[in-house]
């Protein structure tokens, strides 16, 4: 049985990995073996952090809403409870955006929430 060398398939696969590793530090961007390990690790980080990003943004929105709510004399939980009782369904992303860019509108929502706390 004749010997089969990798040839074009191997070269293409290695070029693909080196291309993915472009911009990495030192030998991680030039040597196939090291680059392959780093690319695999990077893809794992990317997979994990696509899920982490959703949690991080929710935390950020809650922090911003809490800060704005306290400027209006409410805690975050009391604000959310008051809005729920008032039947106002605004998601946290929109509330955080209002808190940052339109303080008057957020203050109006805060007064509505204050009036609807038991």
Swiss-Prot record:
Highest taxon in the source lineage: Bacteria
A GO cellular-component term linked to this record: ribosome
Keywords associated with the record: Ribonucleoprotein, Ribosomal protein, RNA-binding, rRNA-binding
A Pfam family reported for this protein in Swiss-Prot or TrEMBL: Ribosomal_L20
CDD domains: Ribosomal_L20
Membrane spanning stretches: none
GO BP term, example: translation
Record-level Gene Ontology MF annotations: rRNA binding; structural constituent of ribosome
Matches recorded under InterPro entries: Ribosomal_bL20, RIBOSOMAL_L20_CS, Ribosomal_protein_bL20_C
NCBIfam families xrefs: rplT_bact
Physiological role: Binds directly to 23S ribosomal RNA and is necessary for the in vitro assembly process of the 50S ribosomal subunit. It is not involved in the protein synthesizing functions of that subunit.
Protein family (similarity comment): Belongs to the bacterial ribosomal protein bL20 family.
Protein name: Large ribosomal subunit protein bL20
Species annotation: Bacillus mycoides (strain KBAB4) (Bacillus weihenstephanensis)
Lineage: Bacteria, Bacillati, Bacillota, Bacilli, Bacillales
């Amino acid at each position: 049985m004749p010997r089969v060398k990798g040839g074009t398939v191997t070269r293409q696969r290695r070029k693909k990995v080196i291309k993915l590793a472009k911009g990495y530090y030192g030998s991680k961007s030039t040597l196939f073996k090291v680059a392959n390990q780093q690319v695999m690790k990077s893809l794992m980080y990317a997979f994990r952090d696509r899920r982490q990003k959703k949690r991080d943004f929710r935390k950020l929105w809650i922090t911003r809403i809490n800060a704005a709510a306290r400027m209006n004399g409410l805690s975050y939980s009391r604000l959310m409870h008051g809005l729920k009782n008032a039947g106002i369904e605004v998601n946290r992303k929109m509330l955080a955006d209002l808190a940052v860019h339109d303080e008057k509108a957020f203050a109006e929502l805060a007064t509505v929430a204050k009036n609807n706390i038991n």
